[in-house]
Amino acid sequence: MTSLNTNVEHRRTRTTISQIIHDMTPENKFYITVADGGSKRFRNKPNDQSRHSGQYQPRNLSGKTNISTQSQFTPRLYGKQYNYNQPNRLQTRSVRPNYYSGYRYNNRTGNQEFYPMQPFNNQSFNNQSRTHQSKTYQHNQQKRSFNGPRNNGPQNNVPRFFQREETN
């Protein structure tokens, strides 16, 4: 083991109590530096070097601002739980891939919030994440439905002899 580097001289360590007390007097005080074994996982700044560089955001994005409803009981589909847009010094992918890019009416790229449930009343439904991207994917009942004709008017999807006859 190398000797302790004191301000007075380089000498072999004599570990007697009187020697330690002598070294801790202010004129010959020595300084011991301990190697930093602090874990790099638990830093206060965002963890932008790991692969999973999402910073946890426990905010309640459901729009129901109820004090008793804590954010841990908020369902997962109302907003992002992690922020995947951290800068990444390693060249790994720091943005979660867009799982909903194949749908119709969705021409946006990047992270999507996605509301898979249809509301009972489409007119009074407003998207909760107005600030992020206003309407990502939603069946618009005013547009044509996905398969088949419009669902108002005559029954176009039944054979012709089942349709109502016009009264002359």
UniProtKB/Swiss-Prot annotation:
Transmembrane segments: none annotated. Residues 37-74, 81-100, 117-168 are annotated as: Disordered. This is Uncharacterized protein R297. Residues 52-74, 82-95, 130-158 have a biased composition (Polar residues). It comes from the Viruses. Residues 120-129 have a biased composition (Low complexity). It comes from Acanthamoeba polyphaga mimivirus.
